[in-house]
Amino acid sequence: MVGKARSSNFTLSEKLDLLNLVKPYVKILEEHTNKNSVIVEKNRCWDVIAVNYNAIGVDRPPRTAQGLRSLYKRLKEYAKQELLQQKEAQSDYKSSISEPTKKVVEMIPQISSFCLVRDRNHIQSTNLDEAAQAGTSSLQVMVDHHPVAITVEVKQEEDIKPSPALVSSPQHNDALEQQEEHELMRVAEGSVSPSLSSVDMRMTSSPSSVPRRDVFHQESGEHLRSLLRCDPQVLQMLKEEHQLILENQKKFGLYVQEKRDGLKRRQRLEEELLRAKIEVEKLRASRLRRDLPEYSSF
């Protein structure tokens, strides 16, 4: 399939000739590093390859070293794609790939291993995508078949009382501590347990009912206040923490004020320096006028 050479495309014979010229320099050209000496050596090799390529045939259009380098990169990429397609199709190696690809594989055997690694990564990513898709579909099925949640609404009554677990009994300290731990766990999980006399089980929400969040804040606040009343050490720690916060805020305020004053002083000094420079320039100008002969005659 050797046709007439054009200015922008390469024929099959031109591609094969380029690969034959590149073959002695493959070791240098395939060294992937940013060393200056290697880059200079690569440029020198491409200059030599371009000279030898243009000396092959007179009827061919002249090619630059940059154009030949771009063609070489395209041939390598095309060889990788062709090997991947050949592996996916599981066809005969010799009959399915083109001559430039065979030449590239002979020159650079590691391209075949690259294609194997890329194919393995593609298979792994496909399996991961299928597993994620299956997990998403199963989660969607679980959401679709989830039963309707029954909301617990508390009637707006004035006789809402705290939970019985909040009442402290001096005779059962251990039992009280266990109850308080269970209550803290329940409050942390957001569970509300009002008395059964004030609970109305309904399927629809009512705008006149008290939200569960208000009940949660009420119970958690009362429980924390009861804990604070029972433990003076916690009160002392909270007091010290509050004092530290106030001291830090005071120090930060002083720091901000000092920084603001320092900026003001700096601005004032810069203004004074600028005025002094203006005065100096005025004095220089007056001295120059006095020293010049044309001004002194006046």
Curated annotation (Swiss-Prot):
Keywords: Isopeptide bond, Nucleus, Ubl conjugation. One of its GO terms (molecular function) is identical protein binding. It comes from the Eukaryota. Pfam families: Myb_DNA-bind_5 (PF13873). It is found in: Nucleus. Residues 191-213 are annotated as: Disordered. GO terms for cellular component: nucleus. Residues 192-209 have a biased composition (Polar residues). Interacts with APBA1 (via PDZ 1 and 2 domains). Transcriptional repressor that down-regulates the expression of the fibrinogen gamma chain. Represses transcription of GSK3B gene promoter via its interaction with APBA1. This is Fibrinogen silencer-binding protein. The lineage of its organism: Eukaryota, Metazoa, Chordata, Craniata, Vertebrata. The gene is Fsbp.
